[in-house]
Design a protein with these regions (language model features):
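Catalytic core of membrane glycerolipid acyltransferases/transacylases, capturing the structured
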Residues: 22, 29, 43-100
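Short amphipathic alpha-helix with an adjacent loop that forms part of the alpha/beta core around
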Residues: 40-42, 110-111
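A generic structural signal for well-ordered alpha-helical segments
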Residues: 27-29, 66, 88, 112, ...
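Non-catalytic C-terminal accessory region of glycerolipid acyltransferases
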Residues: 2-15, 104-200
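Small-molecule pocket liners
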Residues: 32, 71, 167
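Short acidic-hydrophobic, aromatic-tinged amphipathic segments that line or gate anion-handling sites
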Residues: 36-37, 94-97, 177
Length: 200
């Protein structure tokens, strides 16, 4: 399958994995020194949506520290036009137009899942710049997981985004949204992420 940027999903995965393992992972580990808890909850294979809170542009790359799997993150299209564009492209991120429903991005995410891949989604839909621990969740993560036949693994990032900032990345137990409505699965995901944040 060809992506809209001219690279196949497989090519994006291979390139992104090499870049992240050789450069980004060591740099992020040294700069943030995060504590990773519950990474064993991420399935080693099979379709999975990894979804959690979003406060910093580094979040999707921090999640890469916790898993050897390639996670194709859904990211706003503007990132693909700026200085960080090569990083997002090489990592196999999926560009999303947030002005409305982006059917092409959803189809691409579902195809990745149906091939047994992993997709990362921030269900808040944007970075949380408020004093609230979480913004309301949009239904996209649950809907994509259901249509892609995927498990959902909740995660939470807490602490300060700096060295010695006690940054933690926590993963909860996976659950299947198959027998749930999209609304029920979204509520369960929100509760799981909230519980992870409150556990710290």
């Amino acid at each position: 399958m060809r992506s809209e940027r001219g690279l196949s999903v497989a090519e994006n995965k291979d390139t992104g994995f090499r870049v992240i393992t050789s450069v980004i992972k060591p740099a992020f580990k040294m700069h943030f020194s995060p504590t990773i808890i519950g990474s064993e909850n991420i399935p080693k294979d099979g379709a999975v949506v990894i979804a959690g809170n979003h406060k910093n542009i580094s979040d999707q790359f921090l999640v890469f520290l916790a898993t050897k799997r390639v996670v194709n993150y859904m990211a706003k299209r503007e990132y693909f036009d700026g200085a960080l564009a090569p990083l997002f492209k090489w990592a196999g991120c999926i560009p999303v137009n947030r002005d409305g429903f982006d059917a092409a991005a959803v189809r691409r995410a579902i195809k990745i899942l149906k091939r047994g891949g992993a997709v990362g989604i921030f269900p808040e839909g944007t970075r949380n710049r408020t004093d609230k621990s979480l913004l309301a969740f949009k239904p996209g993560a649950a809907a994509i997981a259901k249509r892609g036949g995927a498990l959902i693994v909740p995660f939470a990032i807490s602490g300060e985004y700096r060295k010695n900032g006690n940054l933690k990345i926590l993963f909860g137990e996976p659950f299947s949204p198959e027998s749930m409505s999209v609304e029920e699965a979204t509520d369960k995901l929100y509760s799981a992420v909230s519980d992870l944040l409150n556990s710290q």
